[in-house]
């Protein structure tokens, strides 16, 4: 018994797969065909494309009921995987060559695109490679017009650029923006620190000049007048107390104190009493009498 050829088996499998459209296409076609929700989603005038008139209500009411989610962006991405194209940019109108009004049988011709993701491993550069400048050839996408790209020797910048060229554009852009923001903040903080250091140096210099210009005399005041000692007692009262003490301590002759009766204090002159016979050219009789007696004894 001869086995069927391999090509015939593959053709049979592919035809059986195409005979049944995917659930996503079937549900979408039924939603567009439903005339009760034409205010949300419907065909265009000639039936060659469908239009989502109200994306908010479509995501709120219809998507959870038929597709188990409420993300309109996910629905649009699903359409893109099946080859649907947006007709006009100002509204949500999508078309496909096999998605026509009244032509449900054509849905089996719509095949989902196979997404092939190529993961490129980023190898950390060695110590020798870090010290050298790396040269990377331009990418195949044609975005770079230069023949060669010279990259920095920094490992972080090399990793960011390599991540950007490998397809993870969103992540690398966010990292670059964050890095740029941190760099600008660092520059601003360094500028403020330099200004604060300058202000501190100016204050220190000003205080040094001020202290050096002051005289060493403590009695000097900025107004130019010397400070006077504080008087706790009146001068007159203090002088009277000194006079009374001196009178009590001085010897007395016939009840009259003899000795120095003149005292001086700061700014105060006390009136003194003259001693009997003081500053007089005439001698008193009793002095003359005792003087003669003394002369006789001495002779």
UniProtKB/Swiss-Prot annotation:
The lineage of its organism: Eukaryota, Viridiplantae, Streptophyta, Embryophyta, Tracheophyta. A motif (Nuclear localization signal) lies at residues 261-264. InterPro entries: HSF_DNA-bd, WH-like_DNA-bd_sf, WH_DNA-bd_sf. This is Heat stress transcription factor B-2a. Residues 119-157 are annotated as: Disordered. The gene is HSFB2A. The hydrophobic-rich region (HR-A/B) corresponds to the oligomerization domain. Residues 166-211 are annotated as: Hydrophobic repeat HR-A/B. Transcriptional regulator that specifically binds DNA sequence 5'-AGAAnnTTCT-3' known as heat shock promoter elements (HSE). It is found in: Nucleus. One of its GO terms (molecular function) is DNA-binding transcription factor activity. Exhibits temperature-dependent phosphorylation. Homotrimer. Keywords: DNA-binding, Nucleus, Phosphoprotein, Stress response, Transcription, Transcription regulation.
């Amino acid at each position: 018994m001869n086995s069927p050829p391999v090509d015939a088996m593959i053709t049979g499998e592919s035809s059986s797969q195409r005979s049944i459209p995917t659930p996503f296409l079937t549900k979408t076609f039924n939603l567009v065909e439903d005339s009760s929700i034409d205010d949300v989603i419907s065909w265009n005038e000639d039936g060659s494309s469908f239009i989502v008139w109200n994306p908010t209500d479509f995501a709120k009411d219809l998507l959870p009921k038929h597709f188990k989610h409420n993300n309109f962006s996910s629905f649009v991405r699903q359409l893109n995987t099946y080859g649907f194209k947006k007709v006009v940019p100002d509204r949500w109108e999508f078309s496909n060559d096999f998605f026509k009004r009244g032509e449900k049988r054509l849905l089996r011709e719509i095949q989902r695109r196979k997404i092939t993701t190529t993961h490129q491993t980023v190898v950390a550069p060695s110590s020798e490679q870090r010290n050298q400048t790396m040269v990377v050839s331009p990418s195949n996408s044609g975005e770079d017009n230069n023949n060669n790209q010279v990259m920095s020797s920094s490992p972080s910048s090399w990793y960011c650029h390599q991540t950007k060229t490998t397809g993870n554009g969103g992540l690398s852009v966010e990292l670059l923006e964050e890095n740029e923001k941190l760099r600008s903040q660092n520059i601003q903080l360094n500028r403020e620190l330099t200004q604060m250091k300058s202000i501190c140096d100016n204050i220190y210099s000003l205080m040094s000049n001020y202290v050096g210009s002051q005289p060493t005399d403590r009695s000097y005041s900025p107004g130019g007048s010397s400070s006077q000692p504080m008087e706790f007692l009146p001068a007159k009262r203090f002088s009277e107390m000194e006079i009374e003490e001196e009178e009590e301590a001085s010897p007395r002759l016939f009840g009259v104190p003899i000795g120095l009766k003149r005292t001086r204090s700061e700014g105060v002159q006390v009136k003194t009493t003259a001693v009997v016979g003081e500053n007089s050219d005439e001698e008193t009789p009793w002095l003359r009498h005792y003087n003669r007696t003394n002369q006789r004894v001495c002779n």
